[in-house]
Amino acid sequence: MSNNPGKLIIFEGTDGAGKSTQIKMLANYLRSKGLDVIASFEPTNGPYGQKIRQLYTDRNKVTRNEELELFLADRREHVNKLINPAISAGKIVLCDRYYLSTAAYQGALGFDVEEILQRNSFAPTPDLALLLQIPVEDGRRRITSSRGEETNDFEKAEMLEKVSTIFNSLSFPYIRHINACQSIDNVQRDIIMQVKQLLKMA
């Protein structure tokens, strides 16, 4: 076990906010400072995560309760196999989506947000949650522009408006709001400022 305490930094927000791009940039920055960084994402590439991805094109395959159970099972495996061991080893874990996304997206489908959060109590609390904020329609335009395809069921405007409302209602002390409407470099600047404060970097 490392003498240096590991950290869990998560990136949250509606689709099209630029989370994946910002995680790559932050990982490169932290590694350039000599820090041991692991970048991960949810849903994972594990068996449960792959089943979740299949739902992006056909959500009629499972009930909403079964869908939620898949997210929980995928996260439990992620926590046990990667997140907890990495934190114990003193590494910095950057994660693209975590349980706040489950609360927001499944909450938008009608589940009780507090109940979802309670059911995720097995997962370690993030040291920092960077909530990238962008108007829903701007995010949808980014999705179709980058992928060259239509949005899926999780990315419809009405759904994302509900998701955004839930994200904004969350008031945990580890959440920091980031304006994702800025240039990529300016978004990264704001993210680095928050991360430096967390890691007590000069």
Curated annotation (Swiss-Prot):
InterPro entries from the UniProt entry: P-loop_NTPase, Thymidylate_kin-like_dom, Thymidylate_kin_CS, Thymidylate_kinase
SUPFAM superfamilies: P-loop containing nucleoside triphosphate hydrolases
Enzyme Commission code: 2.7.4.9
Nucleotide-binding found in the keyword field: yes
Binding annotation for ATP: 13-20
Catalytic activities: dTMP + ATP = dTDP + ADP
GO molecular function, one term: ATP binding
One Pfam family linked to the record: Thymidylate_kin
GO biological-process terms attached to the record: dTDP biosynthetic process; dTTP biosynthetic process; dUDP biosynthetic process
GO cellular component, as recorded: cytoplasm
Keyword annotations from UniProtKB, A to Z: ATP-binding, Kinase, Nucleotide biosynthesis, Nucleotide-binding, Transferase
PANTHER family from the UniProt entry: THYMIDYLATE KINASE, UMP-CMP KINASE 2, MITOCHONDRIAL
Task of the protein: Phosphorylation of dTMP to form dTDP in both de novo and salvage pathways of dTTP synthesis.
Family: Belongs to the thymidylate kinase family.
Name under which the protein is recorded: Thymidylate kinase
Organism of derivation: Desulfotalea psychrophila (strain LSv54 / DSM 12343)
Gene this chain is encoded by: tmk
